[in-house]
């Protein structure tokens, strides 16, 4: 996914080319070892009684729970891991297309299509209106409402007919604290707003969810999360920490810190950049000679200028505002790149 994103932006081409063999080995691992039981999903489990019981980004021992509060036991197929795998398959297909390898392109496009269909069938909880955070060892859905499902919007694996219900759940009072997205719904068993992964707010997680919401056209919901994060940063000296508590904003005037949170922390420091991209609705596909750009400024922001955006070996500046000619002015974009002034939908194939 990372190398595919770098290629889409047209940056560090030599570095990406150098790392492609490593990416190919990672794909081999997914195909040969990641899916231990052959059900089409990447699972994790530990081979000894030591090490991490949970091996997704929520790696605390109690980070994956059923809605009734029970802690799920491995092997577990996490929803966001399938979403990342979907993204990796698509990136592999596009790299193959670049070099004229139509066999590999067709194979990984097909794998991505199959994974998406299976995911929307097996992880979807129709009666609840959200995706399970994972499947347990018996392939039963782990049915708690979590922030993980926002990562699925982010990669585009979610069928569009399910996206609205997912979006509504993510920005509901049970999930949105006013500062950011809780890792676990406050209506779920095991919820603790001052836990590591069972009700706290992680800025990078919220930024990814906001990006996913915008990808499916829910710009108002995305902006709501982004403004929550910006307010949280302002209340904490302009710096977003690794995480903070999931207590409701209405209860206290500032976010309550997590006792051992890292600050600064790389994930959190990068979050405002993703939020900025989300507001710009910027989606470059440089290898195909296209860049989608459709800024949608929220109420209260009348002008925005972003300079130095690295695209296709150039540095691009975007100005947005009511006093800007045409509402948007882009400078520095190479002439061979077509600028498409609309958001790219998740189903758009290039």
Model segments located where?
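Extended glycan-interaction surfaces of carbohydrate-active proteins
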Residues: 36-77, 114-201, 234-257, 273, ...
